[in-house]
Design a protein with these regions (language model features):
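Bacterial N-terminal signal peptides
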Residues: 1-8
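Sec/Tat signal peptide C-region and signal peptidase I cleavage site
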Residues: 10-14
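Hydrophobic ligand-binding cavity/cleft-lining segments
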Residues: 17-167
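Structured segments of extracytoplasmic/periplasmic soluble domains
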Residues: 110-113, 217, 255, 259
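A mature extracytoplasmic/lumenal domain signature
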Residues: 165, 179-181, 189-193, 218, ...
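Hydrophobic-ligand binding "helix-grip"
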Residues: 174-211
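Beta-strand/loop substructures that line and gate deep hydrophobic ligand-binding cavities in soluble
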Residues: 199-238
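A conserved amphipathic terminal alpha-helix motif
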Residues: 234-268
Length: 268
């Protein structure tokens, strides 16, 4: 489990829409200058840049009209397929005073994903996103095991877990620990089984990809950056649902940094 809780309130700020904490379902448009494509904090400065500690997380849903249909993922992600159906980034700073091992322990606590809630734009209410989640001994979903420990999450390690999602049912995921040091954690997650909605395939293996970058800034502050992509061949049932993608990404961000997942305002 995560070893800390944030004492302050950190709502989510969209790059294109700002939600007032007092009126969580109302928004006001603000002008935003044209931005380059997303850039994780590797090789170059991150885009979008990190907000200051205490400011809302910066959440951005990127459009094909801005980036083009053949958008190429940043090289450091290792993703090779061009284009996307949905693309969401989150940049934030958060307070954390323990060592990186505590974050690794939380990341490896797969069973703790159960119960994560998100804002459903369809039902206009908070709903449970993850019903159950289990660490696996390998890519076979029948082999449940205890949560992963920090000692197992070494750089280069590949781990598997199973997740029962409210929206897409049961699926198996691969988690690759890209970097693991005292000051930087990088890991990527992608589905290795087909994801279905009422038995209808909506995402084939490798079509839901996410990458997370956690960097220590000081003894009390860490930086968070995530990029989540659904492939351009995703089923039309989810291909155009940007709000759902945003709210799912926000739910995982909040869970990781210790913010209650139902804290107002919702992501979008």
């Amino acid at each position: 489990m995560l070893l800390f809780l944030l004492s302050a309130v950190y709502p989510v700020r969209s790059a294109n829409l700002f939600f007032s904490p007092r009126v969580p379902h109302a928004g006001s448009l603000i002008d935003v200058e044209a931005r380059p494509g997303p850039q994780p904090p590797c090789e170059k400065e991150p885009v979008p840049a990190y907000p200051q500690l205490g400011e809302p997380a910066l959440v951005q849903s990127w459009s094909k009209s801005d980036l083009g249909r053949d958008w190429k993922p940043p090289t450091c992600t290792g993703w090779t397929e061009e284009g996307f159906s949905t693309l969401v980034t989150i940049a934030a700073r958060f307070p954390y005073t323990s060592e990186a091992e505590g974050l690794l322990r939380h990341i490896g606590a797969i069973s703790q994903l159960a119960g994560i809630r998100y804002w459903s734009t369809t039902h206009k209410q908070w709903r449970t996103l993850i019903m159950n989640a289990y660490a696996l001994t390998d890519s076979k979903p029948a082999q449940h095991r205890e949560d992963f420990t920090p000692n197992e999450m070494k750089e280069g390690k590949v781990l598997y877990f199973e997740q029962f999602d409210k929206l897409t049912g049961k699926a198996t995921y691969r988690m690759h620990i890209v970097e693991a040091s005292a000051s930087r954690l990088v890991f990527e997650v992608e589905n290795v089984s087909t994801m279905r909605y009422y038995f209808l395939p909506i995402l084939h293996p490798g079509e839901l990809q996410s990458m997370y970058f956690l960097d220590r800034e000081s003894d009390k502050v860490w930086r968070y950056y995530s990029i989540v992509r659904t492939g351009k061949n995703a089923n039309g049932l989810i291909a155009g649902n940007d709000s759902s993608s945003v709210n799912r990404a926000v739910a995982f961000y909040r869970s990781l940094v210790g913010i209650p997942t139902t804290q107002e305002p919702p992501g979008r």
